[in-house]
Amino acid sequence: MSTPNLYDSTNKPLYGERLIEESKIICFDNPNKKRIYEISIELPEFTCKCPFSGYPDFAKLNIFYQPNSKVYELKSLKLYINHFRDLKISHEEVVNRIMDDLLNAAAPHWIHLNADFNPRGNVSMKLDIYSGQKRN
């Protein structure tokens, strides 16, 4: 029995790469639709690539939301976010795309997506998008 070559040069994607490539946001039923509550999710290792230089951009994403009938499943959200790591896309476009996908997946009562990009060349950027009415 031979040991598998971990550094095989074939172009066959590894299992983690396949999971990321096939990822989509999965939701499950809100366990308490009658209660108003807020969920916060932090994704501290977001990456994508600058569409002009190809250099990696790093950010911390924060999602704050008040669920409607669905809540986000965290593992699927992690895999979905990871699929942007090799994509050449602007900060503004990627954050708006993520917000659109979050809205389409769960249609929360209210949601706030915050992206805090690491400084590059002495410039940092924060981007906030809101949708819906926050309930009290």
Curated annotation (Swiss-Prot):
Q: Which residues bind substrate?
A: Y72, E73, L74, H91, E92
Q: What is its EC number?
A: 1.7.1.13
Q: Which InterPro entries match?
A: GTP-CH-I_C/QueF, NADPH_dep_7-cyano-7-deazaG_red, QueF, QueF_type1
- Tell me which SUPFAM superfamilies the record gives: Tetrahydrobiopterin biosynthesis enzymes-like
Q: Which residues form the active site?
A: C50, D57
Q: Name one GO molecular function term.
A: preQ1 synthase activity
Pathway given in the UniProt record: tRNA modification; tRNA-queuosine biosynthesis
Subcellular location per UniProt equals: Cytoplasm
Would you tell me the Gene Ontology cellular component terms? cytoplasm
UniProt keyword terms in alphabetical order: Cytoplasm, NADP, Oxidoreductase, Queuosine biosynthesis
BP GO terms, sorted: queuosine biosynthetic process; tRNA modification
Superkingdom in the source lineage: Bacteria
Enzymatic reactions: 7-aminomethyl-7-carbaguanine + 2 NADP(+) = 7-cyano-7-deazaguanine + 2 NADPH + 3 H(+)
**What family is reported?**
Belongs to the GTP cyclohydrolase I family. QueF type 1 subfamily.
Described function: Catalyzes the NADPH-dependent reduction of 7-cyano-7-deazaguanine (preQ0) to 7-aminomethyl-7-deazaguanine (preQ1).
Q: Can you say what this protein is called?
A: NADPH-dependent 7-cyano-7-deazaguanine reductase
| Organism of origin | Prochlorococcus marinus (strain MIT 9515)
User: Gene of origin?
Assistant: queF
